[in-house]
Amino acid sequence: MVPSVAKAKDIMRDIASSITANGLPPAITPMVFGFTGAGNVSGGAREIFELLPHEYVPSSALASIASSPPSRWSNKLVGCLLQPQDMVLSPSGSSAFTNAEYTSPLPLPALSCPPIYNILRSYFANPTSYTPVFHRNVLPHLSVLVNGM
């Protein structure tokens, strides 16, 4: 057990130096981290992850990264910030989420909030209207799933 966040960060910096100097073993390269959520849990996990050599990529790049030569990713980790459209297709079958598509049928108060909350409201009100795609499009390409939801 690590006694403090400061000590954990020191350990991660040591690991970062080793990855930079020696690379990752080819058997585990590329090492791809997928982060869900946009709150404090996900933010804290990303804060620690970002102490390591890394590159963030969009989810649309995951399949090509998985098939790329291991040497391309030997000295850094890959991070992907997962969005609602990476989890499910919208009711229209589109992976592009729009505000107009996600008005809640529930009598909820009008809030001034980011569009993601409108999407979540609609999803929780009508989950069967959405088609799951995460298990097919994203999960097979991840080494580590960090659940920040």
Each language-model region and where it sits:
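Dinucleotide-binding/catalytic capping subdomain of oxidoreductase cores
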Residues: 2-32, 43-144, 148
